[in-house]
Swiss-Prot record:
The keyword Methyltransferase is assigned to this record: yes
Matching CDD domains: AdoMet_MTases (cd02440)
Enzyme class: transferase
GO biological process, one term: translational termination
Name of the featured protein: Release factor glutamine methyltransferase
Gene Ontology terms, MF aspect: nucleic acid binding; protein-(glutamine-N5) methyltransferase activity; protein-glutamine N-methyltransferase activity
Pfam families given in the database record: MTS, PrmC_N
Keywords tagged on the record: Methyltransferase, S-adenosyl-L-methionine, Transferase
InterPro entries the record matches: DNA_methylase_N6_adenine_CS, HemK-like, N5-glutamine_MTase, PrmC_N, RF_methyltr_PrmC, SAM-dependent_MTases_sf, Small_mtfrase_dom
UniProt binding sites for S-adenosyl-L-methionine: 120-124, 143, 171, 186
Reactions that this protein is recorded to catalyse: L-glutaminyl-[peptide chain release factor] + S-adenosyl-L-methionine = N(5)-methyl-L-glutaminyl-[peptide chain release factor] + S-adenosyl-L-homocysteine + H(+)
Amino acid sequence: MSEAPAVMSAEQLLREAVIRIARSDAEPLLLHALGRDRAWLFAHGRDPVPAEQAQRFGALVERRHQGEPVAYLTGSRGFWTLDLAVSTATLIPRADTETLVELALERLELTAGVRVVDLGTGSGAIALAIASERPQAQLIATDASADALAIARHNAHAHGLHNVECRLGHWLQPLAGERFDLIASNPPYIAAADPHLQQGDLRYEPASALASGSDGLDDIRLIVADTPAHLLAGGWLLLEHGWDQGEAVAALLIARGFAAVATHQDLEQRDRVTLGQWPHAAG
């Protein structure tokens, strides 16, 4: 008879896993395999883990070792104060984008009827974060991917955010004839030939949400050109971009007629969001 595999505790499983992957990756994968939270791990880390769950964890570790993003393996990612479902149809929300949310909130009055758009919403991260902090605002989240929009709708429902409407379409197409107080977007902004697209987590994320032409600015140009027709006088456009694109994006906004154009840095002190205010009553 062959010997049964040794029963291991959660702590032992983690110690073995960190030989292959980072502990910061191993821990959420273990909790996902166990269906537990961090408080349980702290209290029960020495408890034996059933073989089936240990095997599931081992398979997740192997997939992470091969490069799959933790967020896709667990199906979720924390953003702002929200736990969001994600899939391979959506970009993985990142902490850098919280800079855009903070800047948007600073520019939204605490009054009923404020209208906000999140272009290319993906998982809904930007729209839902704003909606959670400004329940009196009306949010519209657009995306060209029906699969991504289904994830955004799921997340809105899961968090009880009923002030968010999801619309299918490319950038501003679903907004014909409407004007808003603020439009925000984290569009694709990586150059199509950038080697980083073939490295790390980016290999697994949807290319349509990452790359945008030879200089990474094709989609930003489209948004800047078309947004004024959808802004109220004094309305704001906020765009996330790459660390080295601040000057170029600011120049596009200024050339289009935006005022109060400024570039803001993320938590790593890198240029990350450029914004401008539309001063006119018509686009």
